[in-house]
Amino acid sequence: MRPSGRTLGQIRPVTITRQFTTHAEGSVLIEFGDTKVICTATVEVGVPRFLKGQGKGWVTAEYGMLPRSTHTRMRREAASGKQSGRTLEISRLIARALRAAVDLKALGENTISVDCDVIQADGGTRTAAITGACVALVDALNYMRAKDIIKTNPLKHMIAAVSVGIYKGEPVADLDYPEDSAADTDMNVVMTDTGKLIEVQGTAEEEPFSFEEMQAMLELAKNGINELFDLQKAALS
């Protein structure tokens, strides 16, 4: 039995609230149970120096956690003068995933910067961030089209992500903190709405996992992510 009472493949209740902030071209509050992340997408004219003159755009991302998003207060990374390896890794993961969703040529020489700020953490913050960031990205792209910054829609497909793992010997989907902290295996899966994989990050904490268990986790991830696509599309309709 899972601590939350959920079945093995059951994801937490997910809520996607668009236009959550006033200033950003795209903004979303996404809630996976008690995990809550604000995702904002900012449109900027121009691209990084390494892309200038190539006629294509860029999508980048930053991830962070508020000091009291966790059970005990964390020190702000800005106060220590550098970002942690975890923060940088997750920022790069989100950015890679979002770039896989966009035709950078169709974006023109423009940049979309997506900021994902965790305001409350209960496991699965990076997968919640990716799922919410995609909706914020869509709103930013729609803004660009409405303002004639771009002529065609650069979005190739929607993307979403979910965590899966082995908890007490069973494959489970969308781990919350009590499960994540006690799981034998933790895996994050990012997919497109065409059923293709963008990223699979899996690590055995103590007990190695089998190919059969990996297949079972991927099946749970696919089912959970398909639910998330339905929720994204409902939010955008």
Curated annotation (Swiss-Prot):
- Claim: rRNA-binding is one of the keywords in the record: no
Question: NCBIfam families, from UniProt?
Answer: RNasePH (TIGR01966)
GO BP term, pick one: tRNA processing
**Cross-referenced InterPro entries, in alphabetical order?**
ExoRNase_PH_dom1 (IPR001247), ExoRNase_PH_dom2 (IPR015847), ExoRNase_PH_dom2_sf (IPR036345), PNPase/RNase_PH_dom_sf (IPR027408), Ribosomal_Su5_D2-typ_SF (IPR020568), RNase_PH (IPR050080), RNase_PH_bac-type (IPR002381), RNase_PH_CS (IPR018336)
**Domain of life assignment:** Bacteria
The role this protein plays is: Phosphorolytic 3'-5' exoribonuclease that plays an important role in tRNA 3'-end maturation. Removes nucleotide residues following the 3'-CCA terminus of tRNAs; can also add nucleotides to the ends of RNA molecules by using nucleoside diphosphates as substrates, but this may not be physiologically important. Probably plays a role in initiation of 16S rRNA degradation (leading to ribosome degradation) during starvation.
Q: Which UniProt keywords apply?
A: Nucleotidyltransferase, RNA-binding, rRNA processing, Transferase, tRNA processing, tRNA-binding
Please list the reactions this protein catalyses.
tRNA(n+1) + phosphate = tRNA(n) + a ribonucleoside 5'-diphosphate
Residues that bind phosphate, according to the entry?
R86, G124, T125, R126
Record-listed E.C. numbers: 2.7.7.56
Question: Enzyme class, one word?
Answer: transferase
What is said about its interaction partners and assembly? Homohexameric ring arranged as a trimer of dimers.
Name of the gene: rph
Report any Pfam family annotated for this entry: RNase_PH_C
Kindly provide the name given to this protein in its UniProt entry: Ribonuclease PH
Family membership = Belongs to the RNase PH family.
The GO terms this record gives for MF are: 3'-5'-RNA exonuclease activity; tRNA binding; tRNA nucleotidyltransferase activity
Q: Does the keyword tRNA processing apply?
A: yes
